[in-house]
């Protein structure tokens, strides 16, 4: 079994390398067909998108936060959390929502404004000649395919899983848990630094559009407002649904990824890893499309973990006896608080 899995992993990585080269080859072909002359109008934002640039800039700076808050209010108003947002759930969701917005920008700023100019000082804006469409697809593929692998490996490598399990501990879906991640998992998002590097190389405008579009798709996939249901309900929309659910992440496919079981034929936590694009799961055979939603979410033995252990493991460890997060560095608070939990293997540990 291990040999088969290793062979599949090797095959998938090889296919990924080929996919990474596609936008590069397309840009090279364009460059050859134009005899090395890139039209100024091709580098700039297409005229039909020019009007949207201010909107995208506002969405990037504050609009996405407002979008999340508005969706969250609607979700709570509709009673979609079923009174599950209590205790440790509330603490970890709020902290994971606020902390990255305060702590991550300085990290990215240091990488973009200090590290990159020091490491590759002569390469700034060297890709500024790339047409907008080329830069868009280059960043979209490089960013999202990299995140697919980052996500997939955090499910398939037991040690890495402990950094990602925080995101799967929520017994509900929605804006409240969309940002719920271990901070170390977030800081080491490989695609963040990849996109920052491509922006430094001169692809800032395409990066802006990719960021906004990707954020809206991923937030929509986490939302408990199942916007994709009408596409499954009405037969006339089925052709559109067929394309959508294979191209991008939808509530149905991503909710299945957060299910607490795979035994019902709906949940699929061992797949559906795609973030913006679901097509990676289609290509690599890790996807499951049922057009149905799980009855319950989370993990079987991971309820109400302490917020500090979920957010900062292994710096802080859980006080819950038997928890995989109990093997940390620091016990906090200092006064022990032992809580017995059922001795069973979490469903998601079986990876």
What are these regions (language model features)?
Residues 16, 42-75, 87-105:
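Alpha-helical transmembrane segments in multi-pass membrane proteins
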Residues 206, 290-351:
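A membrane-cytosol interface segment of integral membrane proteins
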Residues 19-38, 70-78:
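Alpha-helical transmembrane segments of multi-pass membrane proteins
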Residues 2-21, 56-59:
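N-terminal membrane topogenic signal
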Residues 69-80, 149-159:
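Membrane-water interface of transmembrane alpha-helices
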Residues 1, 77-86:
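Cytoplasmic membrane-interface regions of multi-pass membrane proteins
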Residues 26-44, 109-120:
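Membrane-helix interface motif
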Residues 96-111, 118-293:
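Membrane-embedded catalytic scaffold of the fatty acid hydroxylase/desaturase
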């Amino acid at each position: 079994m291990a040999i088969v899995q290793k062979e599949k992993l090797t095959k998938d990585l090889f296919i990924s390398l080929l996919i990474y080269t596609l936008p590069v080859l397309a840009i090279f072909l364009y460059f050859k067909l134009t005899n090395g002359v890139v039209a100024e109008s091709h580098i700039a934002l297409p005229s039909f998108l020019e009007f949207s640039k201010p909107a995208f800039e506002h969405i990037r700076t504050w609009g996405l936060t407002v979008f999340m808050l508005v969706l969250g209010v609607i979700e709570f108003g509709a009673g979609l959390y079923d009174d599950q947002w209590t205790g440790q759930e509330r603490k970890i969701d709020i902290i994971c929502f606020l902390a990255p917005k305060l702590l991550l920008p300085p990290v990215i700023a240091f990488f973009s404004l200090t590290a990159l100019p020091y490491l590759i000082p002569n390469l700034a804006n060297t890709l500024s000649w790339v047409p907008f469409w080329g830069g868009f697809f280059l960043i979209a593929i490089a960013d999202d395919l990299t995140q697919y692998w980052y996500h997939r490996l955090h499910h398939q490598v037991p040690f890495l899983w402990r950094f990602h399990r925080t995101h799967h501990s929520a017994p509900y879906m929605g804006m409240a848990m969309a940002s719920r991640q271990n901070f170390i998992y977030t800081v080491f998002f490989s695609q963040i630094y990849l996109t920052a590097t491509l922006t430094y190389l001169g692809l800032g405008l395409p990066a802006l559009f990719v960021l906004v579009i990707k954020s809206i798709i991923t937030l929509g996939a986490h939302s408990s407002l199942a916007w994709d249901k009408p596409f499954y309900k009405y037969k006339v929309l089925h052709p559109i649904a067929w394309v959508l659910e294979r191209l991008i992440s939808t509530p149905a496919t991503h909710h299945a990824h957060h299910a607490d079981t795979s035994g019902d034929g709906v949940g699929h936590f061992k797949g559906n890893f795609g973030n913006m694009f679901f097509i990676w799961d289609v290509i690599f055979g890790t996807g499951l499309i049922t057009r149905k939603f799980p009855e319950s979410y989370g993990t079987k033995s991971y309820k109400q973990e302490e917020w500090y252990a979920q957010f900062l493991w292994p710096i802080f460890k859980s006080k819950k006896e038997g928890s995989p997060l109990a093997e940390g560095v620091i016990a906090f608070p200092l006064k022990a608080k032992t809580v017995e939990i059922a001795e069973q293997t979490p469903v998601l540990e079986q990876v």
